Amino acid sequence: MNIANELAVRQHIKIVVTGGVTRGQSYELIGPLASLVLAELTLDWAILGVDALDPRTGATAHHEGEASINHLMATRAEQVMIVTDSSKLGQRAFARVCATDEIDVIVTDRDARPDLLAAFTERGIRVITA
């Protein structure tokens, strides 16, 4: 919700707010109402934040409702970008967002371990460090 609020003033960006239950910890809208709306959309990109990202397990989250909505966004998108800090790389959380082979791009910080970055690039994922 906070990102939608920031981008709403930019006329060249179309903002869709799904509805659903607000999750205060992450400002996400989750639940059946959000799922119903997302199921009707086609997206060019899904840009997702996650709690953990492992080369074998993929992207995961601590909260299953959050993971479910993010999974649905990933399945509705042509491209999936995961944005996460390096402390979450090589980690796993409770609920899967998407498998590694569903990820197109990872954006992380420069403190990421080279072996973990290599594990993602070997799987055909573009890795951007900034």
Regions found by a protein language model. Name each.
Residues N2-A130:
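Conserved phosphate- and dinucleotide-binding cores of soluble alpha/beta proteins
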